[in-house]
Amino acid sequence: MVELKKDLPEIFEEFADQRRNSFLAIKKLKEQGVPVVGAFCTYLPKELPRAMGAAVVGLCSVSDETIPDAEKDLPRNLCPLIKSSYGFAKTDKCPFFYFSDLVVGETTCDGKKKM
């Protein structure tokens, strides 16, 4: 019989703190005048923004809470990942988007091209 896991390991509690610390670190860099480049993809050679003295942050949708806001502009049948990403950018609910001076995204799908 397969044992179903119902509780999260204790280490998961640290994730929220680490996420908050990451947001505060980006805010501190912005206060120091360091430009921030937000990247959706791993195709961006991180050496390019770093050579300009910029910090690089990964942009990734972590929830579907912003999808209703995105659907005010985007079609309902568009990929949830695209709608969530767009929603976080539109609503300023993600500090990484908020502090990004430049956002780099790939064109791996029609949704990302249109976003």
Regions found by a protein language model. Name each.
Residues M1-M115:
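An N-terminal assembly and electron-transfer interface module characteristic of large anaerobic redox
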